[in-house]
């Protein structure tokens, strides 16, 4: 039996459109929803199993991507947003009405500073870049998934076309390590 991973990947990956130029993310509130405008195509979209990311009801993974912080603007009902954990690297701003995480900028000194994490399934528009891998797969155990299901879940992710990792994908991990090495002087800046 197939696992319910996330509603936007359970039946295959969404299709990217070359004409997608950004759009509007909308929370789940039926009255006064929070709206966030994102300019341009998103990057590094992936399914994520961490316990920090917002997930739709019944999903064991989130779908999360990044955009440049300068390309992300709260346009309506921003007064409903509250930072979930001020000590976290990703400052996840959640709607106090429905709980959806609407945007999460990285503001501290980090390789991802200047990027904002978003959940692209909240776009009104279609055509955003689909997930390309799965991160922090083992972390779904921390949220209650039976470890005996993990081999099947990893196999299902691969069938969908999402390589499962227990960190980020190799390219992003190399980027973080390179940034850290330059910061420490181990590599030339």
From Swiss-Prot:
Enzyme class: lyase
GO BP term, example: formaldehyde catabolic process
Binding residues for Zn(2+) 2: 48, 50, 53
Cofactor (UniProt): Zn(2+)
InterPro entries named among the record's database cross-references: CENP-V/GFA, Formald_GSH, Mss4-like_sf
Domain CENP-V/GFA: 20-166
UniProt keyword Metal-binding present: yes
Mitochondrion listed as a keyword: no
UniProt EC number: 4.4.1.22
UniProt-annotated binding residues for Zn(2+) 1: 27, 29, 95, 98
Annotated pathway: One-carbon metabolism; formaldehyde degradation; formate from formaldehyde (glutathione route): step 1/3
Keywords: Lyase, Metal-binding, Zinc
Note accompanying the cofactor annotation: Binds 2 Zn(2+) ions per subunit.
UniProt GO MF annotations: S-(hydroxymethyl)glutathione synthase activity; zinc ion binding
Transmembrane feature ranges: none
Catalysed reactions listed for this entry: S-(hydroxymethyl)glutathione = glutathione + formaldehyde
Domain of life of the native organism: Bacteria
HAMAP family: Formald_GSH
PANTHER family: CENP-V_GFA DOMAIN-CONTAINING PROTEIN-RELATED (PTHR33337:SF40), GFA DOMAIN-CONTAINING PROTEIN (PTHR33337)
Family the UniProt entry places it in: Belongs to the Gfa family.
Biological role: Catalyzes the condensation of formaldehyde and glutathione to S-hydroxymethylglutathione.
Name of the featured protein: Glutathione-dependent formaldehyde-activating enzyme
Organism expressing this protein natively: Mesorhizobium japonicum (strain LMG 29417 / CECT 9101 / MAFF 303099) (Mesorhizobium loti (strain MAFF 303099))
Name of the encoding gene: gfa
